[in-house]
């Protein structure tokens, strides 16, 4: 396969101190890459690169299956999922598998099936990865031109982009079909404390769906993370799936316009940087979703959100003190504000005390006690149900705080369990991974732009200042 650039000009060189090191007959001088840039071997070997990608997919799916079975093997039905450090079973439960009213697990067999299916799939992918890495053709262009490509071929690149978009769109519709036709999904807002239900009355109004994108990202608004009913979530997947599929067809059928050809860098490393940037955005959005949203990530499985645990504590002590004779409507706290109830900046009745900062929390166990002007005093006096008390007491002692040594919960809470909430794990890991992916995006974007501009990044090591300085010792 002919490469359209000379390698020396096309690839920016990272100059090492020991640029003469040769591994497996490859050295930096002839390849333009140092020994540690292993993937660079595959840049123009589409068959081998396919093998690397398929094998990587196999590793990912193997982890999913093995970890899934590990969680099933360790699962104790009598304890909530979030007390057991589970991160995969909550996702399956949220999709409506194996759970009943109140999020109670009634059948673990679907979880077992999921794990086995992923393990079997990973074996197929692993075989394909090894085959293409070791036995298959090094390049696909000659034998399988449909699957072959040259990184500079803009039309082919947008065709590949289109195929990926269609696959993502199909993925979005899988959730829609599960919610509509295949048993429904878990709705934490179902009356009486959550249940699995089919989502029939989808929100398809563009003003509602795209209105989320126009919201402020700050408190009370919360951008797309503020979504709090499944009709909007599933309807959003209809819109997203449709846009992805139509956009995919568009990119397959068209060639890039002149402005896009000029504006973008068209090289393998540039595409890598675009992908890392996109994954970084996904990571940051996922972080915010799992930390703040208790509809897409129901508290029955993931534990309460931070604001939810705080409000649950205020509610629990309001219930206790009201039983002991306190007048919750008029009791004053140490600051002169209401001890149990006060008003928000916009006039709603909210919980008093330190939890006032979380006054815009919405949670299924609390909403029935609200009226048109916030918390309703008469409902708080007469209508609190036992399930609401039980759930808030449970959430109060399971705040999503905690450190790596698993001493979780609130430090001052004597009844707390030593655990780290899955919300803490998932939010932290996705933030950290999103950050690293962003750094990788900047790194590869800088290299790709430098290569396209025709210059090499880096200092000429022969004249590096440190070589002319007095040794420290």
UniProtKB/Swiss-Prot annotation:
Keywords: Acetylation, Chlorophyll, Chloroplast, Chromophore, Manganese, Membrane, Metal-binding, Phosphoprotein, Photosynthesis, Photosystem II, Plastid, Thylakoid, Transmembrane, Transmembrane helix. The chain crosses the membrane at residues 69-93, 134-155, 178-200, 255-275, 291-312, 447-471. [CaMn4O5] cluster binds at residue 367. It comes from the Eukaryota. The modification Phosphothreonine is found at residue 15. GO terms for molecular function: chlorophyll binding; electron transporter, transferring electrons within the cyclic electron transport pathway of photosynthesis activity; metal ion binding. The keyword Chloroplast applies. It holds the Pfam family PSII. Binds multiple chlorophylls and provides some of the ligands for the Ca-4Mn-5O cluster of the oxygen-evolving complex. It may also provide a ligand for a Cl- that is required for oxygen evolution. PSII binds additional chlorophylls, carotenoids and specific lipids. One of the components of the core complex of photosystem II (PSII). It binds chlorophyll and helps catalyze the primary light-induced photochemical processes of PSII. PSII is a light-driven water:plastoquinone oxidoreductase, using light energy to abstract electrons from H(2)O, generating O(2) and a proton gradient subsequently used for ATP formation. This is Photosystem II CP43 reaction center protein.
């Amino acid at each position: 396969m002919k490469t359209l650039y000379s390698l020396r000009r096309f690839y920016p060189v990272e100059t090492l101190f020991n640029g003469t090191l040769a591994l497996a007959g490859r050295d930096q001088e002839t390849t333009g890459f140092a020994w540690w840039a292993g993937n660079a071997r595959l840049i123009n070997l589409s068959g081998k690169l396919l093998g690397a990608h398929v094998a990587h997919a196999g590793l990912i799916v193997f982890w999913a299956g093995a970890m899934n079975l590990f969680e099933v093997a360790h699962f104790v039905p009598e304890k909530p999922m979030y007390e057991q450090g589970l991160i995969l079973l909550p996702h399956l439960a949220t999709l409506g598998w194996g759970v009943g009213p109140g999020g109670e697990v009634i059948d673990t067999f679907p979880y077992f099936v999921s794990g086995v299916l992923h393990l079997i799939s990973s074996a197929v992918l692993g075989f394909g990865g090894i085959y293409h890495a070791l036995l298959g053709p090094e390049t696909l262009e000659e034998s399988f031109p449909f699957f072959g490509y040259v990184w500079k071929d803009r039309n082919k690149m947008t065709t590949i982009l289109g195929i990926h978009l269609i696959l993502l769109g199909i993925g979005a519709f899988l959730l829609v079909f599960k919610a509509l036709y295949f048993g429904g999904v878990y709705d934490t807002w179902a009356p009486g404390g959550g249940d699995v239900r089919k989502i029939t009355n989808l929100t398809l109004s563009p003003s509602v769906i795209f209105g989320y994108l126009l919201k402020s990202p700050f408190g009370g608004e919360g951008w797309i993370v503020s979504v709090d009913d499944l009709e909007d979530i599933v309807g959003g997947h209809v819109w997203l799936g449709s846009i992805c599929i139509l956009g995919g067809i568009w990119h397959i059928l068209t060639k890039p316009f002149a402005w896009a050809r000029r504006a973008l860098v068209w090289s393998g490393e540039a595409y890598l940087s675009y992908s890392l940037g996109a994954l970084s955005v996904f990571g940051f959005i996922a972080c915010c979703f799992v930390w703040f949203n208790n509809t897409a990530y129901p508290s029955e499985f993931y534990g309460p959100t931070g604001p939810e645990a705080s409000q649950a504590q205020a509610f629990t002590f309001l219930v206790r003190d009201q039983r002991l004779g306190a007048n919750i409507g008029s009791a004053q706290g140490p600051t002169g504000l209401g001890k149990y109830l006060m008003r928000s900046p916009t006039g709603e009745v909210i919980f008093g005390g330190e939890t006032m900062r979380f006054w815009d929390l919405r949670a299924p166990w609390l909403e029935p006690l609200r009226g048109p002007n916030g918390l309703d005093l008469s409902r708080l006096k007469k209508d609190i149900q036992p399930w609401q008390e039980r759930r808030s007491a449970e959430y109060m002692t399971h705040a999503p705080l905690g450190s790596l040594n698993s001493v979780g919960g609130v430090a001052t809470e004597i009844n707390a369990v030593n655990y780290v909430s899955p919300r803490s794990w998932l939010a932290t890991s996705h933030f950290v991974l999103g950050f690293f992916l962003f750094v990788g995006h900047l790194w590869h974007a800088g290299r790709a732009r430098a290569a396209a501009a025709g210059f090499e990044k880096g200092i000429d090591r022969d004249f590096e200042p440190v070589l002319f300085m007095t040794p420290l010792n």
